[in-house]
Amino acid sequence: MKSTSEFRRITLTLACIIAVLAGAAALSAPLLLPRLFFLRQDSLVLAGLLGLLFGAGGRPAFAWSRRLPAVRLDYRTVAAGAGAAALLLWAGTYLLFDNYPLTRDEHMVVFDLAVFRSGRLAAPLPPEWRAYAAALTPDFLFHLPGNAAWVSSYMPVNAMLRTLFGMIADPALMNPVLAAAGAVATFDCARRLFPKSGGAQAVALLMYATSAQVLALAMTNYAMTGHLALNMIWLSLYLRGTRASHAGAIGIGFLAIGLHQIVFHPLFALPFIDHLRRQGQWRTAAVYCGCYALFGLFWISYPHLVALSAGLQTQTGMSGGGGFITNRVLPLLLHRDHRTVQLMVVNLLRFVTWENLALLPLLALSFGAIRRDESIARPLAYGILLTILAMAFLLPYQGHGWGYRYLHGLIGNCALLAAWGWRDHCDRDEVRGFVRTASLATLFGSIPFLMWQAAAFVRPYAQADRTIGRINANMVVINADYSDFRVDQVRNLPDLTNRPIRLASYWLTPADIRMLCSRGTIAFADPGPMDLHDLGVDRVPSSNKFDALRAAAPVQCLRR
């Protein structure tokens, strides 16, 4: 960079782009979660980021931070810091989030863990409950013949790893440990890419460790922490470039593809495999492609294995590539979301908000390395772009999530590209001053604010869950009409040993209620106690259908 004015021009350009997108998001963000999160969380942090960007390049604004000492890191220091951070995140899982699985995605990890802990791939569902499978677990179930058994529709590796980890420690510690492993792997990648630049190594680790998204998701059981950790371990092995390390990376790839959703890891890995081809390493690239094709076929056929393990015949079109395309891919391709542009604007702004506030300018400064095709700079950038495009096309609405979780596995890419930007431009005082000031603002401003907001959002749902759990009845019907969020309170163990057993109202009829009353007592969760969190919409009244279900319950089985 030749002058201060160039960095000033970059930051002003970024500030103008963010201001325009933020204005568009404020006017057009879809209702419920996207609008709620943008207005209550992201917009306030974006305002702070805009202040930093507009002030960048001004010597008085950042001069004080240039006197901060340089940091030199080694593996021992990083590993010790990562271990300490893992313990703090483990504590935060309980202190901030009550170790409560807020979303259906998170609950299904708990559900699958209980299934796998019993030594099965799918738990048998008693015959008398099979007609009520959808009411017992409304979303994300494999559709096994006759509902004879059940397990989530997600790939199993995340829950399997959690099951194995739970044999030796608290399962809630697994994601903090994975986040710590990802940090060490990110530092290892930076050491290999920038062996002569301790500052670049420190910046890569800084971008990772001060990501509010990394911290928040590590305190949940979302699979995204695993995606990030496995991706960075994969890249660390890939960069070693030996036969053994490539074999290790391929093994990690098998786990990463089956972790949660098949699509995420291949989008990360494909640019690096193509990089091997462009470097003339055709055989190695071919081995990766062949192995990944086999892994894809294996995981696509996983429903067939689940059915066979339960002694069931798979339904036509359920297993294999044809079933995967018919049941998983085509619905996403055929049912397009007309709000794609608005959602992706909100998603990307949310991602920027939940990262270190210095990340975006550093990514802009890495463009020179990307343009020069230096080392793996292009594959790092291509992985980010591929994932954004794929998610915009396939699934622009993420629902719940701290930050933009569909980009979570690429945070390591962003951190390494930011390190490139630092290495190329750290000789400029204004760059050093901006990064240090923005990092301090992140550490003492945006991270505490976002953690407070996330904890405040989760707490009422955890309280509602405990309230429902204390209802003195064998079963409770939860009014899930008109709301995508009340239905998340319908959560049961796979062996149905929890009391009360919870059922979603919109899958039941008055005849079902009369039948269920022959098995025990029933209570009804009214909408009033469920409306514990304002989602930016009017309160949802009790529906006629829900009232009809309650009226159908014989007096002798009804509990209030």
Task: Set out the residue ranges of the language-model regions.
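Membrane-lumen/periplasm interface segments of multi-pass, membrane-embedded glycan/lipid transferases
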Residues: 132-144, 300-372, 393
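Membrane-interface alpha helices of multi-pass inner-membrane proteins
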Residues: 163, 189, 204-209, 232, ...
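Signature aromatic-anchored transmembrane alpha helix within multi-pass, membrane-resident enzymes
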Residues: 72-84, 246, 251-252, 288-294, ...
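Perimembrane helix-loop-helix junctions
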Residues: 236-244, 264-293, 372
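Hydrophobic, aromatic-rich transmembrane alpha-helices
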Residues: 60, 179-187, 270-278, 341-381, ...
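Hydrophobic/aromatic-rich transmembrane helices and adjacent perimembrane loops
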Residues: 109-110, 224, 378-382, 399-426
